[in-house]
Amino acid sequence: MGFSLASTIPSFIFSSCKQKLKDLNLKISLQAYSFAPLLMSGKFDIMDFPEIVRNTYGLNGAEYWSIAFMNKEKDKNFISELNKKSEDLGISNTIILVDDINIQTMEQGPSLASLKKEERTKAIEYHKHWIEVASKINCHSIRVNLKSDVGSEEDILETSGESISKLAEYGSSYGVSTIVENHGGLTGNAKWLVKLIKDINSDFVGTLPDFGNNGFCMKRERLDLSNLTKPCDQQYDKYEGVKELLPFAKGISAKSHEFDDKGNDINTDFEKMINIIKESSYEGYIAIEYEGGMLNLFGGKGNYLAPHEGVIATKTLLEKLI
């Protein structure tokens, strides 16, 4: 995967390319979803990801996206080679974000939160597969989504709890946790999500707090990749939301979109977010998850950087604050 740097890239991007961590308990990792537009145009190969993380960005934490495997995870030799590459480069593989969605048609698979038992059973089996994949590349967790267009909060709490409990039990034998991200809908309500985690009460269940506005959007026309740029009808306070989810966090997504001329994300006060994290008991990786490229791909109206430049901008911002 090759990158070319345009002459128009803002100068702030290059002001700090060496990782300087003020807090040794917090580290920076990179989420493969940052390169989703390149994946969709055939310019990103997940096999190259460990090398990109290490040699292009000087990081040692890799966070994966299930879609980027392009079904190659079913090949034992492929997975073995990916794991060996990671180990040889000194990369810590952390989390796989699991999505069951056709990126051509945007059709989504069965939901773990469905009110239909048959649908939940299919979703559970799908995610068990990814628990096995995660264990083979030494990731500690898979991230799941809980989407449901029907049912009360109580109904979805019950069905989600049942599904995740089964995944937690299955994952315990692999040393792999099941974690839930605030990904819109009911999961955008941090209090609801905290109740879910507490009700399940398992060491193999947790949260993945996400900085993004979309993640804390509790009500919108439809929640999927194709409506990333649509307005939210009911927004949860994301700073309070992150604070509420942190006690159960097994990872953090530093979602970024667009930057001003000083290098700050214009949608999220990163300094405020990082201070909230520092005041918590969280230790571990904060993942760069640049989404500006995807917003641009789906018609967003903004001054979005290309994936590589967006990752560098997010990395620079995090390094300044951690």
Question: Residue ranges of each PLM-predicted region?
Answer:
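C-terminal segment of N-terminal export signals and the immediately downstream linker at the start
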Residues: 11-33, 38-41
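Conserved, mostly hydrophobic/aromatic
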Residues: 30, 53, 86, 123, ...
